[in-house]
Curated annotation (Swiss-Prot):
Pfam families: AA_kinase (PF00696). HAMAP family: ArgB (MF_00082). It is found in: Cytoplasm. Belongs to the acetylglutamate kinase family. ArgB subfamily. Keywords: Amino-acid biosynthesis, Arginine biosynthesis, ATP-binding, Cytoplasm, Kinase, Nucleotide-binding, Transferase. One of its GO terms (biological process) is L-arginine biosynthetic process. This is Acetylglutamate kinase. GO terms for molecular function: acetylglutamate kinase activity; ATP binding. The gene is argB.
Length: 304
């Protein structure tokens, strides 16, 4: 196994040329291993709002494409939606990690995610030499959905109405594959459509997980604002099985926005995605180090 690649820091420009060459050489086995493979990355959290991390992310995505991998980006945008709602005098409400989405909120979600946020990401990637194309689940009939029936996690007899929040019924990845074949980088907004052409706000982690499954991705990486999954004492859990995850659900260790993230990650692992990682998006280049070295950042989810 190759020695770990040093974590990037502000001292990187001062590394001797020979050491820089060694770092690049250590990445070669991983470049060979993942050449031609699809990697689905859920982009969210601080990595989307910190300018330096935004730049790092865009450069990392372009590098992965240039060395022969096929990155697919699925993005969130919770803080941006909250800001837009605040300007309209509305406050976001969440139930079990899902945003309650009435008709007005759905309109905001569509123009924030499918417009402002998506175009910012596409622009960043293209500015550093990539060829990114923005999509929503409507494009190419990619993401079909229906209204999510949310049962209370403590009392199954209670069902919560979360408005136009959707659950995925089918994903047609044809448009994503066509873009990949032409060397584009797909950037997907988590908006689906129903049988009557109604729009649905879908959790971005769930979209990333389902898309990774249908694309038979080699890796699914979910960027977060935490080091990974933490136990009740705040200690990082670096490796979790399905059984351990069930226990963490039951005792309340996993809650809030982490609920759909872990559920989606586990579903992808059970459905054949080779490696599923929850990664600290606040660490510069953590995604790149996870792929191109034996450094471990965050939590790995296993189906067994």
């Amino acid at each position: 196994m190759a020695p770990p690649v040093p974590a990037p820091s502000s001292d990187l420009p001062n590394i001797a040329p020979r050491d820089k060459a060694e770092i690049l050489a250590q990445a070669l086995p991983y470049i060979r291993k993942f050449h031609g493979k699809t990697l689905v990355i859920k982009y969210g959290g601080n990595a989307m709002t910190d300018p330096a991390l935004q730049q790092d992310f865009a450069e990392d995505i372009v590098l992965l494409k240039l060395v022969g991998m096929n990155p697919v980006v699925v993005h969130g945008g919770g803080p941006q939606i909250d800001e837009a709602l605040s300007r309209l005098g509305k406050k976001g409400t969440f139930i079990q990690g899902m945003r309650v989405t009435d008709e007005e909120t759905m309109e905001v979600v569509e123009w924030v995610l499918g417009g402002e946020v998506q175009q910012d990401i596409v622009g960043l990637i293209n500015a550093v030499g990539g060829k990114a194309v923005g999509l929503t689940g409507r494009d190419g009939g990619m993401i079909r959905a229906r209204k999510l029936k949310m049962v209370d996690k403590d009392d199954p007899s209670i069902e919560h109405d979360v408005g136009q929040v959707g659950e995925i019924t089918a994903i047609d990845p044809a448009v994503v594959k066509a873009l990949q074949d032409d060397q584009f980088i797909p950037v997907v907004s988590p908006i689906g459509f129903g049988e009557h052409n109604e729009s649905y706000n879908i959790n971005a982690d769930m979209v990333a997980s389902k898309l990774a499954t249908v694309l038979q991705a080699e890796k699914l990486m979910l960027l977060t604002n935490t080091p990974g999954v933490l136990d009740k004492a705040g200690k990082l859990l670096t490796n979790l099985s399905a059984r351990e995850i069930d226990e963490l659900f039951a005792d309340g260790t996993i809650s809030g926005g982490m609920l759909p993230k872990i559920a989606g990650a586990l579903d992808a692992a059970k459905s054949g995605v080779n490696a599923v990682h929850i990664i600290d998006g606040r660490v510069p280049h953590a995604m790149l180090l996870e792929i191109l070295s034996d450094q471990a950042y965050g939590t790995m989810i296993r189906s067994h």
